[in-house]
Amino acid sequence: MVGEGPYLISDLDRRGHRRSFAERYDPSLKTMIPVRPRARLAPNPVDDAGLLSFATFSWLTPVMIRSYKHTLTVDTLPPLSPYDSSDINAKRFQILWEEEIKRVGPEKASLGRVVWKFQRTRVLMDVVANILCIVMAALGPTVLIHQILQHITSISSGHIGIGICLCLALFTTEFTKVLFWALAWAINYRTAIRLKVALSTLIFENLLSFKTLTHISAGEVLNILSSDSYSLFEAALFCPLPATIPILMVVCAVYAFFILGSTALVGISVYLIFIPIQMFMAKLNSTFRRSAISVTDKRVQTMNEFLTCIKLIKMYAWEESFINTIHDIRKREKKLLEKAGYVQSGNSALAPIVSTIAIVSTFTCHIFLKRKLTAPVAFSVIAMFNVMKFSIAILPFSVKAVAEASVSLRRMKKILIAKSPPSYITQPEDPDTILLLANATLTWEQEINRKSDPPKAQIQKRHVFKKQRPELYSEQSRSDQGVASPEWQSGSPKSVLHNISFVVRKGKVLGICGNVGSGKSSLISALLGQMQLQKGVVAVNGPLAYVSQQAWIFHGNVRENILFGEKYNHQRYQHTVHVCGLQKDLNSLPYGDLTEIGERGVNLSGGQRQRISLARAVYANRQLYLLDDPLSAVDAHVGKHVFEECIKKTLKGKTVVLVTHQLQFLESCDEVILLEDGEICEKGTHKELMEERGRYAKLIHNLRGLQFKDPEHIYNVAMVETLKESPAQRDEDAVLASGDEKDEGKEPETEEFVDTNAPAHQLIQTESPQEGIVTWKTYHTYIKASGGYLVSFLVLCLFFLMMGSSAFSTWWLGIWLDRGSQVVCASQNNKTACNVDQTLQDTKHHMYQLVYIASMVSVLMFGIIKGFTFTNTTLMASSSLHNRVFNKIVRSPMSFFDTTPTGRLMNRFSKDMDELDVRLPFHAENFLQQFFMVVFILVIMAAVFPVVLVVLAGLAVIFLILLRIFHRGVQELKQVENISRSPWFSHITSSIQGLGVIHAYDKKDDCISKFKTLNDENSSHLLYFNCALRWFALRMDILMNIVTFVVALLVTLSFSSISASSKGLSLSYIIQLSGLLQVCVRTGTETQAKFTSAELLREYILTCVPEHTHPFKVGTCPKDWPSRGEITFKDYRMRYRDNTPLVLDGLNLNIQSGQTVGIVGRTGSGKSSLGMALFRLVEPASGTIIIDEVDICTVGLEDLRTKLTMIPQDPVLFVGTVRYNLDPLGSHTDEMLWHVLERTFMRDTIMKLPEKLQAEVTENGENFSVGERQLLCMARALLRNSKIILLDEATASMDSKTDTLVQSTIKEAFKSCTVLTIAHRLNTVLNCDLVLVMENGKVIEFDKPEVLAEKPDSAFAMLLAAEVGL
């Protein structure tokens, strides 16, 4: 209601003058009009609402009715109000935050103080509404109930008019109370949503301001933007409520003292004593929650790593290791959650416990002092204490909100005070100079704000937000710095690039080469401004485009990935597609360039991802191009086409910096730089450097394969065949080679071309509104997970006994008053008069007192037992569901991970687990307490005043209609909110992956804009969901006000046969029921909504189909299998899913034991699919693979995969130590580890690290270069001692020299093994025994490389010719 308009983001106008009150609060003042005269066309109906519509949530009624009649979707709901939008509120919050920092500095700045300033006007208005509500709430039970009871016990029945007036007054106060209460929540919800969107947007903007991230982990960011932002939402809702407690306590204390005397102070004291106890419990809860959140971050981070590295984990059969790791972390998390749960459960139970203790102690003390007590006084005090119970009842909500918000604000402040370093990039003075580095010495940024990390964690974690699945994460621009390991592991940052000096003029092509870890990618990072300049100058002129070493692909279609926010120009776009060799790929995709690319490009091959990344750069039409090894993932034909058509022709006149390991391309560069150990070793033209016969010339000789068996003869033959073919023919072949099938190692959709304007069935499955609908099966699953029906029944019994004891105490007091009071009613002159003896009888044996005190003790005892039992049960359920879902997902086939976005899975394991761990128990506990209290109230009222049930039955029809509409609407809105959260999650993770690319193309604003759109969409659905709860609550309250009025009339007008104590009990209970019934229904609905998370997890338990494990057949497999390593494919066919084309079609081949086979073919020919088949990541459509006379389908998956070894195309390292990455199972000695490190030329690098084998490996292994990561993966493979080795482009990220050394190592280390090598660089397969050439999933050639090279029409000879011709 109250707040700034969408364009008034501060109190000052552009000239610095303070805005007038009317200007700042114009929208809010319009809302103050009781009834707006006519409907307007605001995007959100709340902006057209008058005060009555706003306070009663009537503006939401059309949405509720629509939800009952039709299924709601994201598109059918109105958008978020502009006044509540991310953009406006983030700007306003930022102004206040900057003022705070300017005033006290970043370290002393209080984010909590800024939050208060941001919402104080609205909070004050909320408090005013709450105070008015509390005054009305206290007035009814204290004054009016007392007057009504006094009236019926001491006044003759002839004065009916007074009784009716008192009843009308009671109805008025109760109705006004619920109206002010609804108004307070209406204000609160919009306040909370504004705070949520403001801070989440500001956090995201701040994270995106960094070019590299060093101060936060991936697990933290997911938790902060999901759980923490929601914690602030709840804090904004509940924190203002305690402000009314002092007023309520004073009013009730004064009146209690007035009607009861000094003994009323006993009950008041009980409340006052318990309030600091709750505050202490809040502090304790905050401590436990803070500890639990840090463990949750670790679990989410490890889960993220698992999901993004799932392919390698499956190939290495490490599922059990990861399951144990996750389960161990979960156990630690559960222990901390248990402690927090005990405290929280105690807080929740305090309301009924404190109320009972206060009432019992007050009356017991009163009676022992032999003070007089009548029914009007007793039940007025009870009604008043029940009103005071509100102060204790709301405190658990407020305490929990404050505890969690304090933790969240601390985490958020850490992000907000972190500032990106100033840019060191300057502008060259000469306009013809595009790049200028003069004596530039650079280092990686020192990590900050990670106090929790051990000293060894001072390693430079340069952009820890990227996904841990290396083949899918975005930028490897900072990777080549492993050679500087001892320097950047030290306490202060040391240089990685030393005294770099060179100049690149406009239109020139600079080639950069060097060994693994020499600093090539670091140099690109330096040009992007991602490092720290220690000395010298780095000058860059003009806008640039950047192609990272491993392509960043975001979720969207191909065209969106290429355009990257630029306007579509058909001619320019088609040309870009052609020169990047994508035309045939797009034609074969089911929807052309409108085909949806799965998250991280899951349905594309590595070469396709890289060419789309290159196409994005070409289409951007920039002056400077930084290309970090863009052609390593494509074969020779495609590489030649792209280099000739794209880099040499299309980019002619542009300035290009090309980092490459494919040294044949350097001949065409205007200048070449050779890096070694972060320094320029040689610099000049290709010709000059060759004439110098230095290190560069040696690298070129390595390229020519002088170490291979007679490769010169093979090359010479290929060259002869090349000369026979015209250049035009070769170019045409190169274009045709630009993409046969779409997907290599991933699933193709279909070969049939479909209308690109109507994509109907894309790869990534979207969540439907029906997913997550809560049914009885959901509760059944949850109950079974919690320990079974017996355990759940015992927990319910404890709730029953606790609330029953509380209700019994009040009922027993009524009995006591009934028996002990001498009330004589007689008819005199047609009037009924009652005289009361105001002293209680039968106190000498103290039976009534003892039973009364026993009821208090039982409430306390059952409350404590219930708290421990309920917390253990709910956490057992959430942990059981977590483990079951994780175990199901772990064993799902790769197709599941290809079609399910990681953002959606992370949503399940972060936000949904937070719901099950914390929020569901909290709501469920309150609901069960309220439910049993409602039941006991109805039972007692039926016993003492049965006519009340007739009144309730009369309004039951209206109640059921409301409930039906409400239940359906809330369920629909919760589904929509869940669905809209997943794209928001995916965008966050995708943006952090592509941080370097986003900055290079200057698309930060576009990325933030999309975040705001998705954030607003999800927040609007969250707001609608919560408003729907209040929509129902208000209408239920009004119904119960009518019931209260009717009961009050019946009490006033009823016959004298019903005792005064029964009437008093009925009135006090009906007042309590008036608010309690709607709270119970609403809390129950909220609890059911929280069960949506359980249902979403249950769906994975039911729908995740495990891989076909096929256990051993008895006697079919020897213990030492495979002993030889012979592989036979028999008529083998494979497709990724039903109704999709075959990716391997009728393979028949035999590979003898100990042979080395090079597998080559164009992009998408099925090379990587061969590896998927061998490891049974995909089951065959028909045919068999036989290894040493054993059909692999008869072997258990774990047994099969542990016997084979895969060295992946993209290196995968996990967070941990070097030792853990080499030997996760801990089954090898240190000596064995050093031996394999020496054989892979990594021993010296690891020896330089302070911790050596125990040195930390950061997320994605980013403290090692890509090449070094690959060498570590090679060392890992050597340890496994397998008879069959598959190398999938394993040396693509290595320079030719290291490649040569590694190839010789492979030949020596695996000489008794069968080795299959998938490669694009043909020099890596020339020394193989056999070469397997694939095309369209079929074997087209299979022979010795020299034999195939001598055949002029062989496909292998054409591939060689293309490479040699470069």
Curated annotation (Swiss-Prot):
GO CC annotation, single: mitochondrion
Transmembrane segments: 125-145, 152-172, 235-255, 257-277, 349-369, 377-397, 788-808, 850-870, 931-951, 1038-1058
Ligand binding (ATP 2): G1161, R1162, T1163, G1164, S1165, G1166, K1167, S1168
Residues holding ATP 1: G514, N515, V516, G517, S518, G519, K520, S521
Membrane topology classification: Multi-pass membrane protein
Lineage: superkingdom: Eukaryota
Region of interest (Disordered), residue spans: 470-492, 726-749
Protein name: ATP-binding cassette sub-family C member 12
Source lineage: Eukaryota, Metazoa, Chordata, Craniata, Vertebrata
Gene name in the database record: Abcc12
